[in-house]
Amino acid sequence: MGPVWLWLWLLVAEVLLPVHCQPFSAHGDKSLGASQPASHQSLEPAPAYHKVTPTITNFALRLYKQLAEEVAGNILFSPVSLSSSLALLSLGAHADTQTQILESLGFNLTETPAADVHRGFQSLLHTLDLPSPKLELKLGHSLFLDRQLKPQQRFLDSAKELYGALAFSANFTEAAATGQQINDLVRKQTYGQVVGCLPEFSHDTLMVLLNYIFFKAKWKHPFDRYQTRKQESFSLDQRTPLRIPMMRQKEMHRFLYDQEASCTVLQIEYSGTALLLLVLPDPGKMQQVEAALQPETLRRWGQRFLPSLLDLHLPRFSISATYNLEEILPLIGLGNLFDMEADLSGIMGQLNKTVSRVSHKAIVDMNEKGTEAAAASGLLSQPPALNMTSAPQAHYNRPFLLLLWEVTTQSLLFLGKVVNPAAG
């Protein structure tokens, strides 16, 4: 009998809604990389998620660069979603396969043993899942196992304890009905934002590992829809203009201009513990900015942001992206996961079970009532005073990068590039 397959399917969704909020507080209270105020709690051990979040960021930047070489258009994915699913899968891997998965994510297993990695993800997922009145962030893992299988109880127990993964019995010989059941679960868990997400699978599928992350936030400073201009120009490249709706506001935001990377970086806050970085390359400098995307660059930006009144122009758009990553992940070290040498016997107690597909889907929606990303143009100076008539203009009218962070854990929830805001 030929090999039977396990699938890893991930999806993410974002929806951002309006809020009439309190006056803007001091900009020092929420920032990427900001240190916590000194208190008696500073003597307590650091949360376990600190052992994984820097590695997730590094993994995300490496994966982004590979995607940028392969994809000409919009890019969007969730580093937390993808890395946590691969780490969960490693629970059922043995020997070299487990080592390969975790090391490909960027973990030094001598410094951070596998047990500490899993406890770090447990801490991260638990913290992100804590209820918040101003930010809704819902993550989940589900395992769909063929009903003929006898999965290892140790794997199921660890997956539930560390990753909150719930296991379901499935009949993959009835592919259409089972696919509908899984899609119904996803639609319910993402409040109808993701519909019909699951790709077709064959009758010899044994397992589907599904991850979802649903992000719902409110702008700290919502846009006035009456200020939106319906037909402003967005440059797909230096020769091709596109007419799109452009939102506008004058508000306080943090920003900087990075001469080394040739880009403008704008930080926009949400209510709650999330913020968005919008990175606008100078004309013709996108590849230079992408090459400069390193953890050190992000730390430098976090230290240099200054608050200023800005005349901000952001596109209104909705984009999605879907990837089959089985050709991309081997380029960052995950090769054996997709061949018969992979040892995933910790899941089902059998060898010769391999992963056939890693699918990842992300959705982002941005409008006046709540925004998540924007298109690019730059701020080249910082004003000496809050003068409404002389506020510098941040006009996002060409391709740009977006990085969406949860501040408490310093975790990168979404990373992407908006090339065409009208691509859908």
Curated annotation (Swiss-Prot):
<protein>
    <recommendedName>
        <fullName>Serpin A11</fullName>
    </recommendedName>
</protein>
<feature type="glycosylation site" description="N-linked (GlcNAc...) asparagine">
    <location>
        <position position="171"/>
    </location>
</feature>
<keyword id="KW-0964">Secreted</keyword>
<dbReference type="InterPro" id="IPR036186">
    <property type="entry name" value="Serpin_sf"/>
</dbReference>
<dbReference type="InterPro" id="IPR042178">
    <property type="entry name" value="Serpin_sf_1"/>
</dbReference>
<feature type="glycosylation site" description="N-linked (GlcNAc...) asparagine">
    <location>
        <position position="352"/>
    </location>
</feature>
<feature type="signal peptide">
    <location>
        <begin position="1"/>
        <end position="21"/>
    </location>
</feature>
<dbReference type="InterPro" id="IPR023796">
    <property type="entry name" value="Serpin_dom"/>
</dbReference>
<dbReference type="GO" id="GO:0004867">
    <property type="term" value="F:serine-type endopeptidase inhibitor activity"/>
</dbReference>
<comment type="similarity">
    <text>Belongs to the serpin family.</text>
</comment>
<dbReference type="Pfam" id="PF00079">
    <property type="entry name" value="Serpin"/>
</dbReference>
<dbReference type="InterPro" id="IPR042185">
    <property type="entry name" value="Serpin_sf_2"/>
</dbReference>
<feature type="glycosylation site" description="N-linked (GlcNAc...) asparagine">
    <location>
        <position position="108"/>
    </location>
</feature>
<feature type="glycosylation site" description="N-linked (GlcNAc...) asparagine">
    <location>
        <position position="387"/>
    </location>
</feature>
<dbReference type="InterPro" id="IPR000215">
    <property type="entry name" value="Serpin_fam"/>
</dbReference>
<keyword id="KW-0722">Serine protease inhibitor</keyword>
<keyword id="KW-0325">Glycoprotein</keyword>
<keyword id="KW-0732">Signal</keyword>
<keyword id="KW-0646">Protease inhibitor</keyword>
<dbReference type="GO" id="GO:0005615">
    <property type="term" value="C:extracellular space"/>
</dbReference>
